[in-house]
Amino acid sequence: MTFARIAGTGSYLPDNIVTNRDLEQKVETSDQWIRERTGIEQRHIALPGQSTVDLAEQAALNAIEAAGIEATDIDLIVFATTTPDKVFPSCACILQARLGIQGCPAFDIQAVCSGFVYALATAEKFIRTGSSKKALVIGAEVFSRILNWEDRTTCVLFGDGAGAVVLEASEETGILSTHLHADGRYEELLHVPCGIANDFDAVKAGQAFVEMKGNEVFKVAVNTLGRIVDETLEANQMQKSEIDWLVPHQANLRIIAATARKLDMPMDQVVVTVNRHGNTSAASIPLALDEAVRDGRIQRGQVVLLEAFGGGFTWGSALLRY
């Protein structure tokens, strides 16, 4: 049987760091308020002129190097983002050209904070069916460009960054299962209420901002992530104790802790970066995964659960043996 196995990970964060103290100077908030409700202490914000693909390129190069391959060995690019450089072509195509790759399929996926899990699941299917041998999967965002920096309920939450993995076809066990879901009835609880075909004038005026009803999102997220943990374990006939690491979407420390409790997992088996990165949307899971791989926490052969919840609502999980 052919599995899709992670051969290498990579990530990149902009140099510019914005702390909670910095935000105290911009909006009516406080470091204590932000920490107590979200766990966030700082976030990285892209510099003017720094784009989503700029961040993704560095993460991709790091992942390719870690995998021990050449960029031209890549035969599929799946790019998860909500903040593309252009309406078209896709970020995947722009990145493909920068990496000197020609001819392979390259496309974007938009599932907001669940985007990386969606992209990983898609690439895994290509590999399982023999349509790809080495896939580059990316989650990258410049979410700071769609934030209203006068809205204290949203501007304190998000950051910019990029993460990537190289998936390769292997006889060794890799991704064990993926689980994807969505429910569009919750559209307006977390959205940007304008776009290309709807209120484009607001976009042109630079007024395309994230709007969120945080309390409602929190309630649905906690319940939904609890259910997908059960679904993932049941699909693999696994016990909670068999999972070595949880790498969750980094939205809010309270949501992360609730998922860990669902797994009866101590927090030292949970990869947490939200305190330093904020919510980087589709980039958060690959950023956290790369950090834990590079610092030696996640080892080959260990079982890792990835899970995410985002606008749409969308949610998903991936269980893998690293």
UniProtKB/Swiss-Prot annotation:
The keyword Transcription regulation does not apply. Belongs to the thiolase-like superfamily. FabH family. Catalyzes the condensation reaction of fatty acid synthesis by the addition to an acyl acceptor of two carbons from malonyl-ACP. Catalyzes the first condensation reaction which initiates fatty acid synthesis and may therefore play a role in governing the total rate of fatty acid production. Possesses both acetoacetyl-ACP synthase and acetyl transacylase activities. Its substrate specificity determines the biosynthesis of branched-chain and/or straight-chain of fatty acids. The keyword Lipid biosynthesis applies. It comes from Marinobacter nauticus (strain ATCC 700491 / DSM 11845 / VT8) (Marinobacter aquaeolei). The lineage of its organism: Bacteria, Pseudomonadati, Pseudomonadota, Gammaproteobacteria, Pseudomonadales. Its EC number is 2.3.1.180. Keywords: Acyltransferase, Cytoplasm, Fatty acid biosynthesis, Fatty acid metabolism, Lipid biosynthesis, Lipid metabolism, Multifunctional enzyme, Transferase. This is Beta-ketoacyl-[acyl-carrier-protein] synthase III. One of its GO terms (cellular component) is cytoplasm. InterPro entries: ACP_syn_III_C, ACP_syn_III_N, FabH, Thiolase-like. Pfam families: ACP_syn_III, ACP_syn_III_C.
